[in-house]
């Protein structure tokens, strides 16, 4: 009996998700959370009742090796599923598990779409999550609540897999809200720190704005197409009166979840969470959810060039803003955070020029080297007693050779060095941009941002491999832990091989014609960036910049000052004035008691003015009244 490859792929994929969902409940038997502040920001979900441990004491159970083994097994199964799919030419599989409300006009069902996007993301996501989970066992070992860390971590990955596999708006919304809620829990893991609590709340608020866009899209899609199936919504193009609002909802949703310009401040602030959370958040889960949604629905944009232009300019602006801000930062986690925002902008710009496949290609390659960068940072920060200032990490390569080598490799991949993961996807995006007839401004912004990426990436390498040693001799530096080394080496292999493997066996490069000059554009951009950083490092060491442009980039284009301070203060004052004018001086004064008193006084004064005691005015008014009455009577009788 011959087994259909599609059956094997679908069985493996659904089994992986089912095993992950069930095994998460065994990732931790410790539900004790340390005392938290009594406020909404530091709210935590407690599972003491589920653990049958009313005293909240930590149970003597270590779930780290079990969680790592589960993720390792599932990662290997996902790779097998991916290889079978490659041999089967990535035939899309649409699974419908059950139908709800069959007697209703709207087709509400649970659908999964196992296509090229999901099957590749399944492998990439599980490999990256496995590596980060293994690193977490080393990093969170001293945390008093570290045993409970693996459960929300696993739930985070599961919700992202639900989001990427779902073909039903119901499941899309479930996964979308799941990663949002769990990001709040993980960012505020150290909730006794005010910065962590406020950062988690900031992430929720900005993502709520994006959720408005997704709900708008879902509502109008169901209203116009009478279906919850995403494929049917895209195939049966909605009514033209609503499609523009649907596209606006998609753009707003992607901007909120993927931290595009205007809704970006939450992403750098999320660095207050544990480093494994930052690694998972920035590499293969929440921040790429918005981009993935645009990739899934990119066909809706094909007939609306203005919408594509908005997406392109938004992505280019985000990439330029984040890259220009990163070059002026000294907090190494903030530098990598802004680099994530810049790369997300590049992905969105790729969708804007009509290349969603290239955007997804960059999602997959970016996941490996960005996760590796964060794990390297976590190792360095952990060894330097939570020191995050890049200028105080000079000479770290002599003390941590493996970590420094992986950090340099990740930075080189980020800047697009040939034959590393980032080169293959960024090269194709820049070539496609130069060959497209899309908005020139958006393309130019993306190219300049790519050049600046080289600047801040090489800046990290320069300080880490500097001959000067600014590290405290008391820092407990060491690389003896196998969980750290194995995770870094695994991701480094992905950084080296993933771009080549994906470009040759997974993705079919888009067909477009470029001139030799345009073909050399990516390499030229990298060379220009290296030239800029060399000149800057040689000149700025003795001539520090004190200019408006430097202040602008250091202060994030004054965005936070304007939006969080000026606009907030202005809106508060105007709303206070309006409410005071409407309520205190409105209903309660002008229209209320004082208004009645003023009206009565005015009527009384008018009545008094008419009764001044002059006989001639009384006689004149009587004659006028008699004349008017007589005239009207004559007119009526005649």
From Swiss-Prot:
Localization: Mitochondrion inner membrane
Any one GO CC term of this protein is: mitochondrial inner membrane
Q: Which InterPro entries match?
A: NADH_DH_su5_C, NADHpl_OxRdtase_5_subgr, ND/Mrp_TM, NU5C-like, Proton_antipo_N
What is the topology of this protein in the membrane according to its UniProt annotation?
Multi-pass membrane protein
Provide the E.C. number(s) assigned to this enzyme: 7.1.1.2
Catalytic reaction annotation: a ubiquinone + NADH + 5 H(+)(in) = a ubiquinol + NAD(+) + 4 H(+)(out)
Q: Which GO terms describe its biological process?
A: ATP synthesis coupled electron transport; electron transport coupled proton transport
The UniProt GO MF terms for this protein read: NADH dehydrogenase (ubiquinone) activity
Q: Where are the transmembrane segments?
A: 7-27, 66-86, 112-132, 169-189, 203-223, 242-262, 275-295, 307-327, 335-354, 365-385, 404-424, 445-465, 487-507, 520-540, 618-638
NCBIfam families annotated for this entry?
NDH_I_L
Q: What does this protein do?
A: Core subunit of the mitochondrial membrane respiratory chain NADH dehydrogenase (Complex I) that is believed to belong to the minimal assembly required for catalysis. Complex I functions in the transfer of electrons from NADH to the respiratory chain. The immediate electron acceptor for the enzyme is believed to be ubiquinone.
- Entry similarity comment: Belongs to the complex I subunit 5 family.
What is the protein's name according to its record?
Answer: NADH-ubiquinone oxidoreductase chain 5
Q: Which organism is it from?
A: Paracentrotus lividus
């Amino acid at each position: 009996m011959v087994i259909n490859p599609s059956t094997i792929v679908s069985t493996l994929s659904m089994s992986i998700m089912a095993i992950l969902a069930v095994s998460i409940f065994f990732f931790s038997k410790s539900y004790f959370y340390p005392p938290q502040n009594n406020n909404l920001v530091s709210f935590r979900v407690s599972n003491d009742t589920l653990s049958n441990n009313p005293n909240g004491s930590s149970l003597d159970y270590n779930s780290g090796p079990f969680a790592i083994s589960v993720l390792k097994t599932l990662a290997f199964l996902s790779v097998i599923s991916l290889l079978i799919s490659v041999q089967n030419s990535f035939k899309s599989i649409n699974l419908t598990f059950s139908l709800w409300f069959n007697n209703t006009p709207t087709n509400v069902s649970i659908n999964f779409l196992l296509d090229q996007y999901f099957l590749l993301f399944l492998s990439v996501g599980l490999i990256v999550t496995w590596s980060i989970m293994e690193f977490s066992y080393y990093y969170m070992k001293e945390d008093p609540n570290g045993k409970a860390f693996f459960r929300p971590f696993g739930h985070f990955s599961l919700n992202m897999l639900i989001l990427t596999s779902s073909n039903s708006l119901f499941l899309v919304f479930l996964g979308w809200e799941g990663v949002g809620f769990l990001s709040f829990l993980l960012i505020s893991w150290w909730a006794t720190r005010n910065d962590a609590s406020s950062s988690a709340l900031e992430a929720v608020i900005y993502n709520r704005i994006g959720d408005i866009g997704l709900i708008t899209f879902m509502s109008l899609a169901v209203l116009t197409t009478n279906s919850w199936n995403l494929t049917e919504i895209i195939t049966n193009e909605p009514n033209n009166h609503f499609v523009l609002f649907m596209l606006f909802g998609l753009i707003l949703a992607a901007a909120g979840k993927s931290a595009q310009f205007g809704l970006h401040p939450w992403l750098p602030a999320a660095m207050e969470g544990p480093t494994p959370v930052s690694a998972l958040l920035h590499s293969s889960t929440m921040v790429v959810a918005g981009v993935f949604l645009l990739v899934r629905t990119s066909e809706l944009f094909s007939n609306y060039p203005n919408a594509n232009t908005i997406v392109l300019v938004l992505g280019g602006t985000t990439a330029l803003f984040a890259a220009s801000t990163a070059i002026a930062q000294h907090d190494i986690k903030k530098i990598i955070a802004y680099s994530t925002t810049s790369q997300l902008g590049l992905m969105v710009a790729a969708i804007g020029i009509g290349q969603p496949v290239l955007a997804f290609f960059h999602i997959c390659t970016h996941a490996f080297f960005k996760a590796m960068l964060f794990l390297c940072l976590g190792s360095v920060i952990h060894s330097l007693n939570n020191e995050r200032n890049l200028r105080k990490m000079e000479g770290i390569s002599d003390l941590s050779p493996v970590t420094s080598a992986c950090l340099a490799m990740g930075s080189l991949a980020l800047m697009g060095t040939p034959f590393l993961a980032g080169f293959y996807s960024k090269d194709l995006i820049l070539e496609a941009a130069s060959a497209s007839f899309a908005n020139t401004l958006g393309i130019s912004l993306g190219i300049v941002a790519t050049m600046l990426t080289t600047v801040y990436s090489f800046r990290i390498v320069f300080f880490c491999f500097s001959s000067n040693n600014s590290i405290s001799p008391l820092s407990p530096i060491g690389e003896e832990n196998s969980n750290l080394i194995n995770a870094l080496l695994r991701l480094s292999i992905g950084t080296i091989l993933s771009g080549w493997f994906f470009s040759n066996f997974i993705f079919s490069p888009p067909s477009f014609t470029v001139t030799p000059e345009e073909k050399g554009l990516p390499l030229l951009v990298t060379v220009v960036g290296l030239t800029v950083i060399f000149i800057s490092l040689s000149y700025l060491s003795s001539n520090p910049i004190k200019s408006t442009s430097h202040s602008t980039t250091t202060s994030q284009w004054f965005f936070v000052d304007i939006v969080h301070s000026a606009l907030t203060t202005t809106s508060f004052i105007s709303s206070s004035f309006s409410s005071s004018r409407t309520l205190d001086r409105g209903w309660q004064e002008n229209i209320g008691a004082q208004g009645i008193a003023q009206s009565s006084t005015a009527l009384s004064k008018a009545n008094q003015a008419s009764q001044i005691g002059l006989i001639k005015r009384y006689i004149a008014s009587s004659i006028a009244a008699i004349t008017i009455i007589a005239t009207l009577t004559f007119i009526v009788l005649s």
